[in-house]
């Protein structure tokens, strides 16, 4: 486990919030401003994400977002696991 990252600071500096849950899960609630690309489509749609900004991935509990971070880092993105979307939303928006 690396050093604790301040996700709020990263997001305030313009990071992209990537929600890798299914479109149905995303429709039921998500972090304001998040982009939804389900994990099983990330490889095909990764170019939709800007490479010049950090990406904070989230999902329901942190498992899928962890996989997404591995994919993103392998493609040269600066990526962070934001964990579950509801706790990330609380961290960012109070």
Predicted segment positions?
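Rhodanese-like catalytic fold shared by cysteine-dependent sulfurtransferases
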Residues: 2-16, 23-54, 63-94
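Short, surface-exposed ligand- or partner-binding patches at beta-edge/loop junctions that are enriched
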Residues: 58
